[in-house]
Amino acid sequence: MTKFTTEEVRSKFITYFKANNHTHVPASSLIPHNDPSLMFVNSGMVQFKNVFTGQGKRPYNKAVTSQKSLRAGGKHNDLENVGYTARHHTFFEMLGNFSFGDYFKEQAIYYAWNLLTKEFELPKDKLYATIYHTDDEAAAYWKKIAGFGDDRIIKIKTNDNFWSMGDTGPCGPCSEIFYDHGEQIYGGLPGTKDEDGDRFIEIWNMVFMQYEQIDKDTSIELSQKSIDTGMGLERMTAVLQHVNNNYDIDLFQEIINFTENIVKVKAEGEAKFSYRVIADHLRASSFLIADGVIPSNEGRGYVLRRIMRRSMRHAHMLGSKEPLMYKLLPKLVDLMGNVYPELKRAESFISSILEQEEIRFKATLERGLKLLTEETETLTKGNKLSGEVAFKLYDTYGFPLDLTEDILKNRDIAVDHKGFEEQMLMQKELARKSWLGSGESKTNQLWFDIKEQHGSTEFLGYTLNEAKCKIIALIKNNNLVNDIKEIDTQFLLISNQTPFYGESGGQIGDIGTISAKDSEVEVIDTLKYLGSIIVHKCILKKGQINVGENANFSIDIRYRQNLRIHHSATHILHAVLHEVLGKHVTQKGSLVAPTYLRFDISHSKAVTNEEITLIEDKVNEIIRDNHEVTTTLMATEDAIKQGAMALFGEKYDSEVRVVKMGETSLELCGGTHVRRTGDIGCFKITSESAIAAGVRRIEAVCGEFVITLMRENDSLLKSIESSFKTNKNELITKVNNILERNKEVEKELEKTLLASLDLSIEQIEKQAAQITGIKLLYKKVGNIDNKILRQAAENLTKKVEDLIMVYIAEGIGKLSITVAVSKAITDKYNADIIAKKLSLFLGGSGGGGQASLAQAGGNDIGKLTNIHEKLYSLLTV
């Protein structure tokens, strides 16, 4: 049997099916674009799901893929086993061949058998097949093609061998191919009591989609039968490299060896599992970041954070004191970057996110581990860590629950999940204690009822600013009403069609007026419910408005034009950011208002002044070029093929609007836009800031608002010139002179304060209290800077060998604690411990420092009256 590399296995699989007239379809993002039921793509069929359900079509009827997949959240969560078992991974590659109404069972089995035995040269006597127990057709084909007897075809009665998407929809029996690693390895055939062993390993699964489930009791034959198959690349490579553990294949071993050379610890014994965790999690983290996921405390971002922090904890176990994962990234890019170019494109961004997250977590990891050690000292095998402690680790130290469980795994200590969930619920209740209910659930049902009765609202605003529309519903205080009579009453109005744009896609809703007969209504906002009901938020200004009557709907044209300007500028900005900052930039959020735009992007560091200038120049150049802005309706798949930018996780219909601005920008967008880029006028960035780890926010103004900004800045400059009694040419010089003078004054003040706090040896001897053979000197001072107190305390402890110096500075509603200990006595008295205990006594949360010098804070000023007693008790224990 020939030995293949991982790359060769992948390549041979794809080449084989291409030679058999399958279209090679590139891997989709790990983020499912059109499937809200999934957090991550977890198999090869996900990108074809709409084809299998009949909701979509492709220009081919046979496909082959190598699909990057991830299982670390929700139903498919393998995280706790990763690194400890032979075949569990968070990130893995799924090889698959697919037929959409072309070939079926016989050809699928033939393709699989031929590839395994002829191309990969697997011994035929090592292979077995499972089938669904009623699928005699598949059994017959296995006998015909592979020559299997009944002893090699295993009938399975459970749903493990019958696949379905849900309670209804396409479904069908499965046939799995198993490889026998040999009797030297424990395990039995599928269906036996020893089936969970590692001897017989599933290497290929074929799903024969031949039925449609109508309800729980009824299914019918599909007229168009399909094939969905999956072969785990890592598993297959292990078989072809004659190893029984996926982590022993070439790809993982190269990462592990590379890590070993950095960490300088052998990948043996318990350390072996940590190396495997790191290798697996490096792949998962890097590919998630490349696909636009950023570590956060919710959703996909939290799954990424859990994976990264689990890896960091294992790096810590190996003795790594510095960030490690970002140092391993170049090796991963070298191994997989040619197959997945997104890794190469986003390498610098991935590296910075990995390093930042490791630095951030390192600050709390050791403290959290210390707390966990203290809390489990008295626990023995089979005991449980309290939910309260687990929640404190999660809430205060950033330990995901599964990380705490992973740490305790080897000690056979569990975590009280119920107690943890109770603590989580308590926190959520506290967070919502000011929320008293608003009839929201009732209102949600109301929208569903309206949609069921009247359908979606037709939007006319792409071509019309004014239209005659029929009022189909009025809502006041969460209730449907027939009319509105009270002047200045706020209410919601729904019509069959409207020129008003409902807030969506970052663009806020239109304002304007609605008039009918003798009535007049002011529209103060326009919203969108259930994705397709446009709702006008109104105030009655005159007369009476009724359900069923026709009314004249008119948007505020100037307001809409300013929205158009800022929305089109957002598209141009997005394209320019790709060019200036890199292809890793993805949209994380946006707001298009009539007076400004806000755009949040994935980028790990501050945008420099030089980059901001370059971005502004390029955006304004595109505006001046006055490109035509065109809008086209096309199939989503065609739009993305043409290079249209789509947002990760955004759900798009089968037909989408594609907005094109010259050759600069091509995006899927349902918003309103200018006719030519020149209509924007001009563009100016007003601010750039961080809003989360790896996410930057850019705000900008366009058109007339740039002129307004310039006038405001000019007015401010004149006011500053007047205050400093100078002109703009000399302003910087004057300000710098003042700053220099301030520095000198601050230095003089610092010297004066230090001198006032200084004491001679004789004064120290006289003022200090004698406690257990050492001197304690406590001083309460005013709101003096910590830096000065630190220096003063250090100066005094250098003069006397047995002194503990404590300063407590009282500010507005807060206390600052400084503790210094002479180095000669730090073996007995630790400034860090004293400062932390004083902080807790004074209502703080602890501090930090070294044995000879530490600082902390507090806020319970009333307890200062008992500070002497507390100090004495701390030092006499």
UniProtKB/Swiss-Prot annotation:
Swiss-Prot/TrEMBL catalytic activity: tRNA(Ala) + L-alanine + ATP = L-alanyl-tRNA(Ala) + AMP + diphosphate
The enzyme's E.C. designation: 6.1.1.7
Chief subcellular location: cytoplasm
Pfam families (UniProt xref): DHHA1, tRNA-synt_2c, tRNA_SAD
UniProt keyword Transcription present: no
Keyword Protein biosynthesis: yes
Swiss-Prot/TrEMBL GO biological process terms: alanyl-tRNA aminoacylation; negative regulation of DNA-templated transcription
GO molecular function terms noted in the UniProt entry: alanine-tRNA ligase activity; aminoacyl-tRNA deacylase activity; ATP binding; tRNA binding; zinc ion binding
Transmembrane segments: none
Cofactor: Zn(2+)
SMART domains: tRNA_SAD
Entry keywords, A to Z: Aminoacyl-tRNA synthetase, ATP-binding, Cytoplasm, Ligase, Metal-binding, Nucleotide-binding, Protein biosynthesis, RNA-binding, tRNA-binding, Zinc
A GO CC term attached to the entry: cytosol
UniProt xrefs under CDD domains: AlaRS_core (cd00673)
Cofactor binding annotation: Binds 1 zinc ion per subunit.
InterPro entries registered for this protein in UniProt: aa-tRNA-synth_II/BPL/LPL, Ala-tRNA-lgiase_IIc, Ala-tRNA-ligase_IIc_anticod-bd, Ala-tRNA-synth_IIc_core, Ala-tRNA-synth_IIc_N, Ala-tRNA_ligase, Ala_tRNA_ligase_euk/bac, DHHA1_dom
Binding site for Zn(2+): 567, 571, 669, 673
Subcellular localization, as worded in the UniProt entry: Cytoplasm
Family statement drawn from the similarity comment of this UniProt entry: Belongs to the class-II aminoacyl-tRNA synthetase family.
Its biological purpose: Catalyzes the attachment of alanine to tRNA(Ala) in a two-step reaction: alanine is first activated by ATP to form Ala-AMP and then transferred to the acceptor end of tRNA(Ala). Also edits incorrectly charged Ser-tRNA(Ala) and Gly-tRNA(Ala) via its editing domain.
UniProt domain comment: Consists of three domains; the N-terminal catalytic domain, the editing domain and the C-terminal C-Ala domain. The editing domain removes incorrectly charged amino acids, while the C-Ala domain, along with tRNA(Ala), serves as a bridge to cooperatively bring together the editing and aminoacylation centers thus stimulating deacylation of misacylated tRNAs.
Name used for this protein in its record: Alanine--tRNA ligase
Annotated source species: Rickettsia rickettsii (strain Sheila Smith)
